[in-house]
């Protein structure tokens, strides 16, 4: 019996890893997406049996070495920073561990949908615009070699590398099942601002062509984290990633059991970042933004600055789930390759 081919899109972000899984039979999968923090720590033995059992789901082995990833790595390692805050992190064992963990989570999604025996896969990963050309082939080869080691002999895998900034546009050009929508084609112009943790990526597609000169990168939402971390340290508060992430969401932290309002520290950091991004949008797109059919603002940072960009650009669009726009775009592209 012919088994349904599978598309897996993995956005290995610098603050969280997002996974989107789709089947070529155009039937939506239950629980088709998942997300976990971009944190990796060397494995250590956990003495508490219940904690150790829970940690198994966040434990991976790469080249004979075991790692904790995600929430377990965050808690057991008391992480103050996300992993992979460097340009060449695709060459690190931390990146390898996150990719393997994401692949395993994708397989769990398939198993939950009674598709655990799938044997044909398209895996789509991505890179920031500024070093897409340089790292595309090294990443493809590394990912293929890594995942080939853990799949079955009868399973077929192809790996594709996309530009992060192009991925949200794929969500406009194709629907959730990989069918063309009629948008973003030869008669339309679109811009994308993809605000990740490490970089913010820009791209401009003009009447069916990606304009190379417009594909570029600026700093990402780590600027917000860095400023808040400095403020928290000066005030004597914890400045780990978990504390800062929750503070951005709620404007509050807990200190010695007491809930403290830190909005006066968080808001200036976000407003400074918003001003920076809007300046970058104006510089990189200029008057071209006026003739765009749409300006997509995606990525995790869209939650912080999306409304400000929309206030200045009436054609700006923030996807329903901007954090997953890249992984979703990857998985839609993967359907086209099956």
Regions found by a protein language model. Give the residues of each.
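Intrinsically disordered or highly flexible coil/loop and linker segments, enriched in small
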Residues: 237-238, 290
């Amino acid at each position: 019996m012919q088994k349904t081919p599978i598309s897996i899109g993995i956005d290995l972000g610098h603050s969280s890893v997002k996974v989107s899984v789709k089947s070529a039979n155009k039937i939506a999968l239950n629980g088709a997406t998942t997300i976990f923090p971009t944190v990796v720590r060397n494995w250590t033995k956990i003495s508490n049996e219940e904690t150790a059992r829970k940690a198994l789901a966040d434990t991976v082995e790469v080249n004979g070495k075991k790692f904790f990833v995600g929430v377990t790595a965050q808690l057991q390692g008391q992480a103050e920073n996300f992993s992979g805050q460097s340009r060449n992190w695709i060459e690190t064992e931390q990146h390898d561990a996150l990719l393997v963990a994401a692949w395993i989570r994708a397989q769990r999604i398939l198993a939950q949908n009674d598709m655990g025996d799938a044997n044909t896969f398209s895996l789509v990963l991505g890179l920031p615009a500024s070093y897409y050309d340089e790292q595309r082939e090294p990443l493809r080869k590394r990912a293929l070699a890594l995942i080939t080691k853990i799949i079955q002999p009868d399973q077929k895998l192809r790996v594709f590398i996309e530009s992060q900034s192009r991925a949200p546009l794929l969500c406009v050009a194709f629907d959730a099942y990989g069918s063309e929508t009629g948008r973003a084609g030869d008669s339309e112009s679109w811009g994308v601002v993809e605000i990740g943790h490490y970089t913010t990526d820009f791209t401009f597609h003009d009447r069916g062509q990606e304009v190379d000169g417009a594909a570029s990168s600026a700093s990402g939402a780590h600027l917000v984290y860095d400023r808040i971390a400095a403020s928290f340290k000066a005030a004597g508060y914890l400045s780990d990633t978990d504390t800062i992430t929750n503070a951005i969401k709620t404007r509050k932290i807990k200190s010695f059991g007491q809930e403290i309002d830190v909005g006066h520290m968080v808001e200036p950091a976000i407003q400074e970042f918003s001003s920076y991004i809007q300046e970058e949008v104006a510089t990189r797109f200029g008057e071209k933004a006026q003739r765009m059919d749409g300006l997509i603002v995606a990525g995790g940072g869209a939650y912080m600055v999306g409304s400000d960009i929309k206030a200045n650009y009436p054609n700006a669009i923030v996807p329903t789930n901007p954090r997953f726009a890249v992984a979703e775009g990857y998985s839609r592209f993967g359907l086209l390759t099956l």
